[in-house]
């Protein structure tokens, strides 16, 4: 599952390393959360850029956008309670995305490891942004 930062990178650099790495996977192995799609669409609309909005729509049309459903709500409650008790909360959108990915047993691909690594039981990766 791709988070908002990974999607944003694909928008900014559609021929980049991340896009190439994702291109080597089966198409049905790559998806995103409706929460990330909401964030991406909002960002494009807020900027008022027709070309950016078009790139966002093209990317989301090419991906499976998963609806937020049960048991993500249970994971959300558990994650939020745990992180708040530990004094290490994460942003509200990231919390929903983390709960969504964890509830489906998916690995979350992000450029925001610092935030998501705090979530217990969430498999998270950050693929290199550039070739080595």
What are these regions (language model features)?
Residues 54, 64-109:
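Active-site neighborhoods of divalent-metal-dependent phosphate/nucleic-acid chemistry enzymes
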Residues 3-4, 40, 76, 101, ...:
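Generic structural signal for small/hydrophobic residues in well-ordered secondary structure
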Residues 1-32, 42-58, 78, 130-132:
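Short, well-structured N-terminal submotif of metal-dependent ribonuclease cores
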Residues 6-7, 36, 72, 97, ...:
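Alpha-helix capping/helix-boundary segments
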Residues 98, 102-132:
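Acidic, PIN/NYN-like endoribonuclease modules and their adjacent C-terminal/linker elements
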């Amino acid at each position: 599952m791709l988070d908002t930062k990974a999607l944003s990178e694909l928008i900014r650099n559609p021929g980049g390393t991340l896009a190439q790495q994702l291109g080597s996977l089966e198409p049905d192995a790559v998806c995103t959360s409706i929460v990330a799609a909401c964030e991406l669409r909002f960002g494009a609309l807020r900027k008022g850029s027709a070309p950016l909005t078009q790139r966002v729509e093209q990317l989301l049309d090419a991906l499976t956008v998963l609806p937020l459903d049960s048991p993500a709500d249970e994971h959300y409650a558990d994650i939020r309670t745990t992180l708040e008790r530990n004094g290490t909360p994460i942003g509200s959108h990231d919390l929903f995305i983390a709960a969504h990915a964890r509830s489906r047993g998916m690995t979350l691909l992000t450029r925001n490891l610092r935030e998501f690594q705090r979530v217990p039981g969430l498999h998270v990766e950050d693929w290199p942004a550039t070739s080595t």
